[in-house]
Design a protein with these regions (language model features):
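Active-site histidine-anchored catalytic micro-motif
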Residues: 2-73, 175-176
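A general structural motif
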Residues: 84-92, 161-166
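A conserved, positively charged/aromatic
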Residues: 77
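Active-site environment of divalent metal-dependent phosphoester hydrolases
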Residues: 42, 91-93, 188-190
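Catalytic cores of soluble, metal-dependent hydrolases
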Residues: 1-10, 17-24, 98-211
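Active-site flanking residues adjacent to catalytic metal/cofactor-binding acidic residues
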Residues: 35-37, 86, 137-141
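Conserved beta-strand scaffold positions in the cores of enzyme catalytic domains, especially
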Residues: 32-34, 83-85, 106, 180
Length: 211
């Protein structure tokens, strides 16, 4: 699909689906903008739960499951300096230590509110553009504050508003060619009034402006 010029939009249950999406993109190098309430940066050595989706970003940048990920044709780890984690506010202790020692860029919701979206993100986009001009956008819908939309059992307070989320998409589109996007981790059992569905549709509409 990517080779045909079509835009891949992946609707997935779990974040580890990123391995297949990135594999399908192939060369040239890609940045990752990962929007999630959690770090997804555990490894088999740090995880408390053993939850594979909690290791998804770490796998994408080559921190763990390297031999397994290498069995997916076309997959190559994304350099950490090209990965941005936005909106995360819940971490396991050892996961946070690992993340802080990495080259992954971490932007929490409070920094966005303190400095503004553009002021916080534009300098970072400029830095990453020295490595690549295209990006993969990954949305775990629990990046949203539960007051906006309760999307699954892992929802955590202090998240992004839908306005902030759509603003991030817009800023990415301004500076990068979008190679693909994924929307993940929706559980209808927790979605009161279909607010999460409406939020996801809003994201898709914003993404469609790229196509």
């Amino acid at each position: 699909m990517a080779g045909s010029g079509a835009f891949p939009l992946v609707l997935a249950g779990g974040c580890i689906s990123c391995v297949g999406t990135l594999a399908g993109l192939g060369a040239p190098p890609t940045a990752i903008v990962w929007l999630d309430a959690h770090g997804d940066f555990n490894t088999p050595e740090t995880t408390i739960s053993g939850f594979l989706d909690g290791m998804a970003l770490a796998t994408a940048v080559g921190r763990c499951w390297g031999k397994l990920a290498a069995t997916v044709p076309g997959f190559h780890p994304v350099p950490e300096r090209q990965a941005v984690l936005v909106g995360a506010r819940e971490f396991d202790v050892n996961e946070r230590t690992l993340l802080d020692s990495s080259a992954v860029h971490l932007i929490d919701p409070q920094r966005i509110r303190n400095h503004g979206l553009r002021a916080e993100l534009e300098p970072l986009w400029a830095k990453i553009q020295t490595y690549t001009g295209r990006a993969y956008l990954h949305f775990d819908l629990d990046v949203l504050d539960p007051a906006e939309a309760h999307v699954n059992q892992f929802a955590a307070p202090g998240g992004l508003t839908l306005t902030e989320l759509l603003g991030i998409v817009s800023l990415v589109r301004e500076r990068f060619a979008l190679a693909a996007a994924a929307i993940t981790a929706y559980d209808p059992e927790y979605d009161e009034g279909e607010r999460a569905v409406r939020a996801a549709v809003g994201v898709i509409r914003e993404l469609s402006k790229q196509v």
